[in-house]
Amino acid sequence: MEPAVGGPGPLIVNNKQPQPPPPPPPAAAQPPPGAPRAAAGLLPGGKAREFNRNQRKDSEGYSESPDLEFEYADTDKWAAELSELYSYTEGPEFLMNRKCFEEDFRIHVTDKKWTELDTNQHRTHAMRLLDGLEVTAREKRLKVARAILYVAQGTFGECSSEAEVQSWMRYNIFLLLEVGTFNALVELLNMEIDNSAACSSAVRKPAISLADSTDLRVLLNIMYLIVETVHQECEGDKAEWRTMRQTFRAELGSPLYNNEPFAIMLFGMVTKFCSGHAPHFPMKKVLLLLWKTVLCTLGGFEELQSMKAEKRSILGLPPLPEDSIKVIRNMRAASPPASASDLIEQQQKRGRREHKALIKQDNLDAFNERDPYKADDSREEEEENDDDNSLEGETFPLERDEVMPPPLQHPQTDRLTCPKGLPWAPKVREKDIEMFLESSRSKFIGYTLGSDTNTVVGLPRPIHESIKTLKQHKYTSIAEVQAQMEEEYLRSPLSGGEEEVEQVPAETLYQGLLPSLPQYMIALLKILLAAAPTSKAKTDSINILADVLPEEMPTTVLQSMKLGVDVNRHKEVIVKAISAVLLLLLKHFKLNHVYQFEYMAQHLVFANCIPLILKFFNQNIMSYITAKNSISVLDYPHCVVHELPELTAESLEAGDSNQFCWRNLFSCINLLRILNKLTKWKHSRTMMLVVFKSAPILKRALKVKQAMMQLYVLKLLKVQTKYLGRQWRKSNMKTMSAIYQKVRHRLNDDWAYGNDLDARPWDFQAEECALRANIERFNARRYDRAHSNPDFLPVDNCLQSVLGQRVDLPEDFQMNYDLWLEREVFSKPISWEELLQ
């Protein structure tokens, strides 16, 4: 008797009767490689329905999509980073810059082009342009600034290809840097920031457009091009360029600009914009320049990894168990399971192709929980692992005694198996070993020894072996060492001696940020909220479109479409810059000192960063990552080299041919990493993830088939699984399996169950207050010299040296000195007897 095709009803399989061979399946019925095979038809009715229901629960919102060929890096390709600086509305200004340069150039050089001059002539003209920035007339100064911008843009009017433009850009920018252009631009930028007339005019305007920020945009464009180009290293760079790069990086991170690093000036612009005092500031350009400045001065992720390894060796810690960047790059994305409807559809298409057999339920569970995602190259390995109990070597983990047809022969490339071994080495904290020993002692001996991790007297042999294994995988982080050292300094301030604080760029930047760090974090999150695609336009929200909206709004449908693409792209670039800045600062501060990181992280949490990021992901994340908000023919440098074709609605809708949008995927990964940084080892913040119902939001993000993004989503799901209840864990077994496969294991972490000691009532306030007290003590000890304990300060007992000290009095006090004497000295009665006693 034949089973009903595709139906989940009762199945009767007669294994005694010979079955006719199944007809060859149609080509369309083949499932894509990696898709789970439809097994629902092999079950009795009730179990099939239950299986389908569980499938639907676990894979709600999943769909089969191709792996995204995305490689995470500090930045996108150089050309892409250059093009994102300019909005499409700024297009006509390229020709204005060229015109300003050529008018000035023809006065001094009549018979040659810029590209035909020698190095000395280039340097002479660059210095002449630099002198022109010092004129008082605003219009003349703007023309000279535009001419310098044209030089920084690669004098594209004399180039025939994009590669030639980029080559001349590098040459021209190092030339401009050599003659001191950047410092002159910083002074001009400072002047524009303090330009109260422009600020008050912008505040009064009902609608701010591109024209209100012309001067600022030109200056920021040149500075961005200098920072971005100098930061990019090329193999063909001259030796003097490499030296200039190192010098420039050191200067950019030093407190040379108003006694603070250049990044602090840009942070000040961000807060001034958010406070409403300067609504005309071109925020996208400010944020892009801020990101590249932080990246250039502090270093990128690979540099951070080498700094981390170096710091561990200085502190006497063992090397890192693996290079996390390399591990993540070698990971493959997990295939999301097909939904129940997909399974039924595949089964109907397959028809009577396969013999049916009854399968044990526990084997089917094992089958469903598997997540094959790595191609295996040899059949021999698979055969060797057949009698292993693990699921690694078997394509289908089914019992040998079941009646099964021979497997279909697939091409070698289509065969999928699990990877051999887990990607990460497990880690154990000192605290975990202490807790394990404490529970073992109280269980077997009846008393505890506190933090003693060496005494194992009276404990059974298996416990000895467990402790040995735990100690083999013990990992001490730099943060733990720094926290212990800080406790020691506070416990014994005299015997501990003076702390030697190395003035690395991260330390200098933190000292500059410290007085106003909460305001900076709130300002960045305000702009992030305004730029998020999920945020609704509100009257009280800040206007981040000042540097993209033209003076005259579009009148045709085509112009409106172009502006719509431009506005969306503008918002995406802002999200990209803010997410990158926050992540870089968190990572560098954590390496420099854990309490610097905790201070910044706590202010992000207090400013509602966690719900803001969850709100960002509460959208169709797949459509955000594949959004086509770009017009490639209008991107720089393509638009200045080639003739612009006539734009049509079809060409605007088509966008580029890329499988995904690099900047959007980069932003999503950064935001997930920030969320991980904020919640890691923080029980109270993990509970915020649970309270804000983040699990379904994060699970939807697993649709994106990109290994790095999936890893950080799974990490966030892992920390909250113990609080989500047994039913959630039961109906999300595939997600649990993916966590097991991809996320690092803590050997005695009970993450998959609800019986952990940490699953205690939520006391957010106590945990955060204790952390805040530690941070305040650290900041007061290291940076707040005014509030130092007077008992520990040196005392000068010499009368002559005390009277000989010069005291700087403010000017207004000196002018009104007589008045002060009259009020504070002569008019007040003095009891000389009491004073002399």
UniProtKB/Swiss-Prot annotation:
InterPro entries: Far11/STRP, Far11/STRP_C, Far11/STRP_N. Disulfide bonds: none annotated. The modification Phosphoserine is found at residues 59, 335, 339, 788. Residues 47-60, 356-377 have a biased composition (Basic and acidic residues). It holds the Pfam family N1221. Residues 18-35 have a biased composition (Pro residues). Residues 378-391 have a biased composition (Acidic residues). The modification N-acetylmethionine is found at residue 1. Residues 36-46 have a biased composition (Low complexity). GO terms for biological process: cortical actin cytoskeleton organization; cytoskeleton organization; negative regulation of hippo signaling; regulation of cell morphogenesis. GO terms for cellular component: cytosol; extracellular exosome; FAR/SIN/STRIPAK complex; nucleus. SMART domains: DUF3402 (SM01293), N1221 (SM01292). Keywords: Acetylation, Cytoplasm, Phosphoprotein. It comes from the Eukaryota. One of its GO terms (molecular function) is protein-macromolecule adaptor activity. It is found in: Cytoplasm. Residues 796-837 are annotated as: Required for STRIPAK core complex formation. Belongs to the STRIP family. Plays a role in the regulation of cell morphology and cytoskeletal organization. Required in the cortical actin filament dynamics and cell shape. Part of the striatin-interacting phosphatase and kinase (STRIPAK) complexes. STRIPAK complexes have critical roles in protein (de)phosphorylation and are regulators of multiple signaling pathways including Hippo, MAPK, nuclear receptor and cytoskeleton remodeling. Different types of STRIPAK complexes are involved in a variety of biological processes such as cell growth, differentiation, apoptosis, metabolism and immune regulation. Part of the core of STRIPAK complexes composed of PP2A catalytic and scaffolding subunits, the striatins (PP2A regulatory subunits), the striatin-associated proteins MOB4, STRIP1 and STRIP2, PDCD10 and members of the STE20 kinases, such as STK24 and STK26. The STRIPAK complex can be extended by adapter proteins such as SLMAP:SIKE1, CTTNBP2 or CTTNBP2NL. Interacts with CDC42BPB. Interacts with CTTNBP2NL. This is Striatin-interacting protein 1. The lineage of its organism: Eukaryota, Metazoa, Chordata, Craniata, Vertebrata. The gene is STRIP1.
